[in-house]
Every structure is written in C-alpha cells, then in structure tokens.
C-alpha cells in the first residue's frame, strides 16, 4: 500500500473532499489557498486564490461545477471549479466554520462561528443562478443558534433537512422549509463534534468527537447505533462506500503534540468494523494529528489530511478486500 504524498499546502490541512466521480480531490488548509488535485496520480491541477484567512471548510457540488469555501476572513466564497474564478463572495459577521451543497446542488448552507459578540448562525442560500449579486441577496433561510455553535453539518435526504453537530456534543435536525428544529439527540457525545460524514445511501452518518469516540447514527431518528472507542480525540471519521468499515483519524490537540508521539502510534488512521465495533487495522504516515479523512467513492482508496500540511492518498491492497470477519 504505497501512498501518494500531496504537498501543496504550507500549513495544516483543515478539510479534504472528493467529488462524486472521485477523479478530483479538493483540500483546504490554514494557508488561505484551497487546492484541487487529480486523485489518480496526485497531480495538482490548480489553486483557488482569493481568501485572506484560514480556510476552514469546503464542498463541491454534484456536477463538479461549483465549489463553496468558508474562511476566517469572514467570507464564504462560491468558485467555478474549472476556471478557479470567484462566482460570488458573501460577507459574514464572523468566521465561516461549515459549508455544504445540497444534494440537488440548488442550495448551499453555511454556518458562522460564535465570536466577536456574534451568535452562531446557519444560512441557506439559493445558488442556481449564482453571480456576484449573491452577496447582496437575502439568504433563503437564517437560523440563529442560541445554545452551542455548529462545528459540523450535513444535508439530509431530498434537501428537506439539515443535520448539525455542535460544540457541546449535541446533534440536531432542522426542517429547511420551516426553519425549526425537528429532532434533538441530546448529549450523545460528552464533548464537541469535530466531523460528520454520511454513508453512501444517506441512511446513517458517523460523527467524530473530542470525547475520544466516533459514533454511528440513524439519519432520521438520530438513534445512536454503534460506538467506536479510542484513547485520543477523534478529528475525523468516514464510512466506506463498499464495505462495512469505518476509518477514524485524530490525535491530541496540535499544541500538545511532541515529535516523539509518532512512535506511540497516536497519529494513525484506524480502521474499525462498522457492525462489530472492532479495530482491525492501523496505518501510519502523518507527523501530527489527522484533521480530515475521506473515502474514494469507489471504496478502493482513501485520503487523509494532517496537521503536517500533507494530504496522503492510500490505495488498498487486495488483502484489504479479502479481510472477512469470522
């Protein structure tokens, strides 16, 4: 299993994402410039130049035409994927922490941080005929978060709901049409949720939390189905599209990291069985915590982005697919 090392960022990676076909891999980091890579050979196809602060989140739409990014410069930007030009730049009152396109690609949602006297807010915008006037248009929906700020977010099925993960460990489902909370999970996690990723069919999702666990939830009822336990904070988790596997990545906070930690196996990608909750493999590689993980849509490889500024693409050996639990 020989990894591809993608070196194009000067600072730590914040999020990575594949497009629907899996031929493109998008990455963003604290160095202000999101990148796009050809996932097969690791060739960098280009950068999206325009942000003035750390880029915290990104998402690409179903057709790989538009890219949305959110950053610490208090803007969320909509980009043309092919040409790298800014379609629209929407100012916000605090840093943008999460951003996602809906399944249809007609709408996008983004959330802002609770900072500088501003409450966390969730915005939904119409991006069907997006142009530079989008910055002046009123969002389709604006939901203020009075309790804990949003740290991760996903669209529910049929663009009807949004699932949000919060800094206090709560998960909630919001009705997009009414702007109201439909389901609240209560505190399934004891600490903040760092990441949330849907399964291929959207019926369940996995969360990664600072409380050292990752959990599998039902997308409609928010019932906790499985728990994957580790010893350190989990920064990211992803579900395999073809096998009953979950991959977890994390490590201590960046400020607590020492160079000796790599030997202790604190920064490995850890593979768990989706149903049996058992860890069956670890992969080394990063010199620091893993901040983001993503499975390739065909399930034959996965990518990880770390605090060391590298994106690593690992292709699985044939033995990985023959590993049957007994």
Swiss-Prot record:
InterPro entries referenced in this protein's UniProt entry, alphabetically: eIF3i, WD40/YVTN_repeat-like_dom_sf, WD40_repeat_CS, WD40_repeat_dom_sf, WD40_rpt
GO BP terms, alphabetized: formation of cytoplasmic translation initiation complex
Location within or outside the cell: Cytoplasm
Keywords, alphabetical: Cytoplasm, Initiation factor, Protein biosynthesis, Repeat, WD repeat
Lineage: superkingdom: Eukaryota
Gene3D superfamilies: YVTN repeat-like/Quinoprotein amine dehydrogenase
GO molecular-function terms, A-Z: RNA binding; translation initiation factor activity
Start-end of each WD repeat: 8-47, 50-89, 145-184, 188-227, 285-326
Principal location listed in the UniProt entry: cytoplasm
GO cellular component: eukaryotic 43S preinitiation complex; eukaryotic 48S preinitiation complex; eukaryotic translation initiation factor 3 complex, eIF3m
HAMAP family recorded: eIF3i
Family classification: Belongs to the eIF-3 subunit I family.
Subunit record text: Component of the eukaryotic translation initiation factor 3 (eIF-3) complex. The eIF-3 complex interacts with pix.
Job of this protein: Component of the eukaryotic translation initiation factor 3 (eIF-3) complex, which is involved in protein synthesis of a specialized repertoire of mRNAs and, together with other initiation factors, stimulates binding of mRNA and methionyl-tRNAi to the 40S ribosome. The eIF-3 complex specifically targets and initiates translation of a subset of mRNAs involved in cell proliferation.
Protein name: Eukaryotic translation initiation factor 3 subunit I
Gene: eIF3i
